[in-house]
């Protein structure tokens, strides 16, 4: 998977061996061709509580993901 194939709001599956498997893309970093992601479960829980701070945010290279499973209609 390349940087250009990923869009904000996409849900990605991490490579085998990671503790959390589903991640939502929240930002694309053009300077480093990396994406900022967070775990889907934590984001959904914080959204329901209207908590502005998202825990477990990672900046990762797209090559670390094996596939994109769906795209959310809402762009964050």
Residue ranges of each PLM-predicted region?
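Short alpha-helix capping/helix-loop boundary micro-motifs
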Residues: 1-2
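Basic/aromatic-rich interaction segments and small domains that mediate binding to polyanionic partners
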Residues: 15, 19-54
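Intrinsically disordered, low-complexity, charged/polar segments
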Residues: 43-76
């Amino acid at each position: 998977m390349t940087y250009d194939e990923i869009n904000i709001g996409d849900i990605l599956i991490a490579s085998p061996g990671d503790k959390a498997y589903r991640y939502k893309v929240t930002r694309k970093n053009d300077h480093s061709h990396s994406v900022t992601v967070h775990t889907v479960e934590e984001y959904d829980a914080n959204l329901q509580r209207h908590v502005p701070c998202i825990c477990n945010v990672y900046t990762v290279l797209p090559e670390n993901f094996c596939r994109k499973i769906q795209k959310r209609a809402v762009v964050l």
